[in-house]
């Protein structure tokens, strides 16, 4: 079931992101003393009692200034309100009622949302009651005193919030989109690729490095599926990045990788694989994300019949973290091989979520053992694999029960992973292998228990 959306609204530095983290019991929203840290919309899941909802953190609203990113922040807040059921206005109890709060309150009255008012930075009950009093003048109903830092008053606020959420029976089921993070170094053509995929100018494209600083979400239907494409800020080495918008954009790019179903890693065909590309590939593998490597600007490469296979071999030798990922040579400028991106990404997601029965896994493992026996230690003790089973998906994860894990070196572990891939597939997704030591008699009990279950 789709979750109703609550838009968090307020002027800069009233503690919106801190309150989001408190209400969702997380630390996902970036929090900093510098005003204006949040620019784009940031979504987090929350729940209270028997209700689930999504909180949308927005940037600090300023209506009398057109400089920097303030118009874009207002546009993002408008988009948040357009999809929300409730607008939660946050004000600063320590600063008191300001003219900016009154402007925002007047603006909110034109929205279709229910409006809830929270007075933040009320660090005690007595102080909160006195601070909240003057905010009745906004005409938005009862102000709820809260402390985002300490949690005071948040229970009462959440009680009120879920009481005005739309009834469960009125909330329609929605298809969950496949999330695709388009990642890469600055100026490799990520935004151009997004525009080519969508067939429209969805993202700003410029020769200036780092034009995209925020993540840009675009929904699109392809291959009979709903996709959410996330264009991210170009990722440079941390020591090359000054503290500021680009710094936070890169942090959000890493978060986009974490929340994606599949990553499209964009490589510049003219530059080849750089050290930063390798770091990014390693990050994707560490996060366990499915991946497709797109080599962009293929139209600018002088080529003959042998150019593509030779370049693929060279690129793969440097992207050894992602030797399991498919590779496409594309041109966002001409549209060459843009359409296959979806079929390749769809296959990668399917394999990422796939599960295989224990019996099939063990057929592959026992076949691998027949071709290459486990190593023997200097003391003459040989490694033994009793059985294996898939314990998770996204990414596919397997536990191998063995007599002693340290008897299996890196070389043999890589061999087993290759054999699992050859026998089971899993193209486009990393595999996780866990080696667990177990006594033989414990294994026999496990196997007997499994046999009894299958016969029931």
From Swiss-Prot:
Residues 354-439 form the KH-like domain. GTP 1 binds at residues 10-17, 57-61, 120-123. PANTHER family: GTPASE DER (PTHR43834:SF6). The keyword Nucleotide-binding applies. One of its GO terms (biological process) is ribosome biogenesis. This is GTPase Der. GTP 2 binds at residues 184-191, 231-235, 296-299. Keywords: GTP-binding, Nucleotide-binding, Repeat, Ribosome biogenesis. One of its GO terms (molecular function) is GTP binding. It comes from the Bacteria. Belongs to the TRAFAC class TrmE-Era-EngA-EngB-Septin-like GTPase superfamily. EngA (Der) GTPase family. InterPro entries: AAA+_ATPase, G_ENGA, GTP-bd, GTPase_Der, KH_dom-like, KH_dom-like_a/b, P-loop_NTPase, Small_GTP-bd. Pfam families: KH_dom-like, MMR_HSR1. The keyword Phosphoprotein does not apply. Associates with the 50S ribosomal subunit. GTPase that plays an essential role in the late steps of ribosome biogenesis. Gene3D superfamilies: 3.30.300.20, P-loop containing nucleotide triphosphate hydrolases. Residues 4-169, 178-353 form the EngA-type G domain.
